[in-house]
């Protein structure tokens, strides 16, 4: 059976169907994210709507600073490659992201339409798995969390509150 996904509707079998804003691939690199994304840009075309570096981050709550050797590494970059898909990525940096292994460097990134949807997906999909970054408000303004599910798949969920994103 093929279901048409219509926001907050039910099909003839009374199965609730949900909509999601966007599902994208998130690629993690060991220091060469900028080089890789410039290559992808040369093939796909387009522009980077955002490039953030680890040096742009504020100090952590315990006062730790980003080491000088990591400050120019990419914290987040995005490259729209179609109307539906954005390729996103970052470098690993510091002890909190030292587990880069080819094979575990791809995550499924979900951008939700509401904070409640982010909570529901995070809580449901992380059950039995390992939370690597608890779902919380971030310094860049998003409600964001990361985990590895019980099947070993890496996930991210992000909600951008439109009221916070307008400057």
Regions found by a protein language model. Name each.
Residues 2-133, 146-167:
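Glyoxalase I/VOC metalloenzyme domain signal
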Residues 134-138:
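Acidic interhelical loop/turn segments
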């Amino acid at each position: 059976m093929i279901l048409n996904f219509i926001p907050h509707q039910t099909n003839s079998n009374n199965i609730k169907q949900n909509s999601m804003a966007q599902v994208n691939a998130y690629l993690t690199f060991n220091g060469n994210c900028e080089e890789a994304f410039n290559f992808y840009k040369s093939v796909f075309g387009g522009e980077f709507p955002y490039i953030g570096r680890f040096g742009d981050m504020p100090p952590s709550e315990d006062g730790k600073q980003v080491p000088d050797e990591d400050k120019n590494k990419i914290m987040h970059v995005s490259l729209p490659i179609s109307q539906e898909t954005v390729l996103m990525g970052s470098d690993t940096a510091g002890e909190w992201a030292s587990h880069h292994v080819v094979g575990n460097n791809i995550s499924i990134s979900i951008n939700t339409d509401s904070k409640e949807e982010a909570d529901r997906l995070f809580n449901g999909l992380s059950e039995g798995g390992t939370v690597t970054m608890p779902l919380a408000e971030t310094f860049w303004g998003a409600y964001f969390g990361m985990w590895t599910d019980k099947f070993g798949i890496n996930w991210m969920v992000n909600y951008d509150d439109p009221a916070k994103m307008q400057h």
